[in-house]
Curated annotation (Swiss-Prot):
<dbReference type="GO" id="GO:0022625">
    <property type="term" value="C:cytosolic large ribosomal subunit"/>
</dbReference>
<keyword id="KW-0699">rRNA-binding</keyword>
<dbReference type="InterPro" id="IPR009000">
    <property type="entry name" value="Transl_B-barrel_sf"/>
</dbReference>
<feature type="region of interest" description="Disordered">
    <location>
        <begin position="129"/>
        <end position="161"/>
    </location>
</feature>
<dbReference type="GO" id="GO:0003735">
    <property type="term" value="F:structural constituent of ribosome"/>
</dbReference>
<comment type="similarity">
    <text>Belongs to the universal ribosomal protein uL3 family.</text>
</comment>
<dbReference type="GO" id="GO:0006412">
    <property type="term" value="P:translation"/>
</dbReference>
<dbReference type="InterPro" id="IPR000597">
    <property type="entry name" value="Ribosomal_uL3"/>
</dbReference>
<protein>
    <recommendedName>
        <fullName>Large ribosomal subunit protein uL3</fullName>
    </recommendedName>
</protein>
<keyword id="KW-0689">Ribosomal protein</keyword>
<comment type="subunit">
    <text>Part of the 50S ribosomal subunit. Forms a cluster with proteins L14 and L19.</text>
</comment>
<keyword id="KW-0694">RNA-binding</keyword>
<comment type="function">
    <text>One of the primary rRNA binding proteins, it binds directly near the 3'-end of the 23S rRNA, where it nucleates assembly of the 50S subunit.</text>
</comment>
<keyword id="KW-0687">Ribonucleoprotein</keyword>
<dbReference type="InterPro" id="IPR019927">
    <property type="entry name" value="Ribosomal_uL3_bac/org-type"/>
</dbReference>
<dbReference type="GO" id="GO:0019843">
    <property type="term" value="F:rRNA binding"/>
</dbReference>
<dbReference type="InterPro" id="IPR019926">
    <property type="entry name" value="Ribosomal_uL3_CS"/>
</dbReference>
């Protein structure tokens, strides 16, 4: 896996291509991140790079956390993320990771927490059809039959029912990078990204089976 970067979703907008077509895009403040730890095969059993993003207040961190973070500099970082790599000799603790690790035209995978919608019913959560709304019907938004019969005499696990909707990790794959502004740490990708504006997202090179390409070191 190539190293990625952490960022903050700013919101959605649109750009116009050379033919005048409106292209929906998501604006992300990507980095800057800092390398906080290098993991090696002899010491940790695998090779990885840990990065940190966002500034945290001193009171929100424990002494062990502050001791770990201060090795990479004087900035106390809020969010940590680890990326497994084949070798990490080109990195050092404290090195800054910026949006320049990506390039226009590259495809990326972006992970984040989806917007939480609370306890939701069948129609909203799963898109079920509703029942009749008139002529004395009492089955407007009810689920209908949920089980079989005497056999098996129970509801199978995994049955789609009402429940908590959203607030889960979602990964959107193959998003195209359409613009980069390294002065503002801005990454613009085509399409939508999980989460609400202000939420933390993880951006990494598109993971294609058999393809070892990715972001530049």
């Amino acid at each position: 896996m190539s190293i990625g970067i952490l960022g903050k979703k700013l919101g959605m907008s649109q750009l116009f291509d050379k033919d005048g077509n409106a292209v929906p895009v998501t604006l992300i403040e990507a980095g800057p991140c800092r390398v906080t730890q290098l993991k090696t095969q002899p010491l940790d059993g695998y090779t990885a790079i840990q990065i940190g993003y966002g500034v945290s207040k001193d009171k929100h961190l424990s002494k062990p956390e502050k001791g770990h973070l201060l090795k990479s500099g004087e900035i106390l970082l809020k969010h940590l993320k680890e990326y497994r790599v084949e070798e990490n000799s080109s990195y050092e603790i404290g090195k800054e990771i910026t949006v320049t690790n990506f390039e226009v035209g590259q495809k990326v995978d972006i992970s984040g927490k989806s917007m939480g919608r609370g306890f939701s019913g069948y129609q909203k959560r799963h898109g079920f059809s509703r029942g009749p709304m008139s002529h004395g019907s009492k089955n407007h938004r009810a689920p209908g039959s949920t089980g079989a019969g005497t056999t098996p005499g129970r509801i199978y696990p995994g049955k789609r029912m009402a429940g908590r909707y959203g607030g889960k990790k979602i990964t959107t794959k193959g998003l195209l990078v359409v613009k980069i502004d390294d002065q503002k740490n801005l990454l613009v990708v085509k399409g939508s990204v999980p989460g609400k504006p202000g939420s933390i997202v993880n951006i990494k090179p598109n993971n294609v089976v058999g393809n070892k390409g990715g972001a530049k070191s």
